Amino acid sequence: MKLAVYGKGGIGKSTTSCNISVALAKRGRRVLQIGCDPKHDSTFTLTGFLIPTIIDTLEEKDYHYEDVYAEDVIYEGYGGVHCVEAGGPPAGAGCGGYVVGETMKLLKELRAFEDHDVILFDVLGDVVCGGFAAPLNYADYCVIITDNGFDALFAANRIAASCREKARTHPLKLAGLVGNRTNKRDLIDKYVEAVPMPVLEILPLIEDIRVSRVKGKTIFEMAETDPSLEPVCQYYLNIADHLLACPEGVVPQECPDRALFELLSDFYSRTPVPA
């Protein structure tokens, strides 16, 4: 199974992805998480450090792909989850999307996809240009991380449009939304009423999740010494169980930008402002 996780920048994709990866590993699956972001910090909470990127390794090898081995680019993180970071070009130069495409090419040559039960792509923000949309060409399911706010749902809608486009030539389905750091879901419900898709889970604002990111640990690792965090782990196990059940998913039909803007902004305009 191949999963592509997208969402607005800063929404908590990487933290969520790492915890989903561990949850899948705890369900007995061999998991490979691939960070597709020039910041190369997707797998930080799994490994506890910024692992060398594929671009770093290729530079060391003078871009001789035949000299790159799996152990050069794949690192083992918490729970036995294997980790890869694509990396990116220097700031202001080159194309990060191209790097993602080359990463897919190298990992296929290394047969990394064949050695794992689940491949999880954690992809840069809501940028869905051709290069950063490349993981959708490989994915069985897309998962969108959002919150209960206008900007995140607007980004989710653009990602849904990319899923619909890719599904024309590839058997891709949108597994659904994960609400992150949100104590309300009224705007999420309004969106999925307009653009039908499953809501896999809603995670409230939990300070320990934010702290886990700073500490470079998954919530599962923190729960080993703090059993009170086990209910938090259950959110991610619920998502993992849903995905492992091979859900039917949907091919979404996104809302036109102007219609979505009116839909969501109308909600805010009708919400009473406290005195």
UniProtKB/Swiss-Prot annotation:
Binding, ATP: 10-15, 39, 180-181
Enzyme Commission number(s) from the entry: 1.3.7.7
Catalysed conversion reaction: chlorophyllide a + oxidized 2[4Fe-4S]-[ferredoxin] + 2 ADP + 2 phosphate = protochlorophyllide a + reduced 2[4Fe-4S]-[ferredoxin] + 2 ATP + 2 H2O
Requisite cofactors: [4Fe-4S] cluster
Residues where Mg(2+) binds: 14
Keyword Zinc found: no
Subunit structure: Homodimer. Protochlorophyllide reductase is composed of three subunits; ChlL, ChlN and ChlB.
Protein name as catalogued: Light-independent protochlorophyllide reductase iron-sulfur ATP-binding protein
